């Protein structure tokens, strides 16, 4: 009898542990996981490569990512107010063909190709855009059809680079027009933004937006709060643009790694580096 009772007790304990383990396993993991990888264009890995070879390179990358369990790909399609797709508003990217405005030969649409290949592998496709950046070096030549040539007043030079002025409604409207074009014509799963903040600061040089602040800064006692507001407005407008077109399409943002240092804010991190809030004018906690 004692042996029988002992066996029943052991069986009950094993069953209880199994149920508990199942509960812990289920509760510790979300229903859906986001396991993403970035594929960038600005390192020159695509430039000037023949179409068939580049397609095979991308297929090999996707196969490798699929084998690693990746379920979403964030693919750079607009690095410098240009396009790695058949844009209605901006020129072909130099990071694809070597010359801005030059279409690929033989013709193909890298974004459409990547959407189809990602979906074949049950991966999400996130169209990655850089909103403000136009030139990483003033030596870089712009295509004759680039929007800068029609509206140079929308842009500012900071250091050796060219940017959309984040304060201007015209800048935001153009960026949203580009996103409208992408979301309307392509089966993207998400729009993803990188470098959505003001440019990284250059020592001894303030971002040249005094004229814009004089025109649009009413109601703000200091320029820093106004700049953060400009970034917030763009984020809100893009969110509304995407949701208004296809509510199921996601919208994501990649901020810089430090919100604020604890030396600036108790809510900050134990870091001592560049800060989103103070240096890049992005309030990432909103």
Regions found by a protein language model. Give the residues of each.
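Bacterial N-terminal signal peptides that target proteins for export
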Residues: 1-8
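The substrate-binding groove and active-site-proximal loops of carbohydrate-active enzymes
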Residues: 42-52, 92-108, 157-176, 218-231, ...
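Aromatic- and acidic-residue-enriched segments that line the glycan-binding/catalytic groove
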Residues: 83-98, 133-159, 195-219, 266-274
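Active-site neighborhood of glycoside hydrolase catalytic domains
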Residues: 170-286
């Amino acid at each position: 009898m004692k042996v029988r009772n002992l066996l029943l007790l052991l069986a009950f304990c094993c069953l209880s542990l199994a149920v508990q383990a199942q509960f812990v396993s289920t509760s510790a993991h979300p229903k859906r996981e986001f396991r993403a990888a970035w594929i960038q264009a600005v390192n020159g890995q695509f430039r000037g490569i023949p179409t068939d070879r580049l397609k095979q390179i991308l297929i090999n990358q996707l196969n490798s990512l699929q084998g690693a369990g990746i379920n979403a790909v964030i693919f750079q399609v607009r690095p410098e107010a240009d396009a790695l797709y058949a844009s209605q508003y901006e020129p072909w990217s130099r990071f694809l063909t070597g010359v801005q405005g030059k279409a690929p030969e033989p013709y193909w649409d890298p974004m459409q190709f990547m959407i189809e290949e990602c979906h074949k592998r049950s991966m999400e496709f996130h169209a990655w855009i850089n909103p403000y950046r136009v030139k990483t070096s003033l030596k870089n030549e712009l295509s004759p059809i680039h929007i800068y040539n029609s509206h140079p007043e929308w842009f500012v030079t900071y250091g050796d680079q060219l940017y959309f002025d984040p304060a201007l409604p015209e800048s935001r409207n153009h960026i949203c027009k580009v996103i409208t074009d992408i979301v309307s014509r392509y089966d993207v799963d998400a729009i993803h933004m990188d470098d959505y903040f003001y440019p990284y600061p250059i020592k001894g040089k303030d971002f040249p937006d005094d004229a814009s602040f004089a025109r649009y800064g009413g109601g703000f006692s200091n320029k820093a709060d106004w700049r953060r507001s400009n970034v917030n407005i763009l984020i809100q407008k893009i969110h509304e643009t995407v949701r208004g077109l296809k509510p199921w399409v996601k919208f994501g943002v990649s901020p810089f790694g430090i919100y604020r240092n604890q030396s600036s804010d108790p809510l900050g991190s134990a870091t001592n580096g560049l800060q989103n809030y103070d240096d890049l004018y992005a309030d990432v906690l909103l």
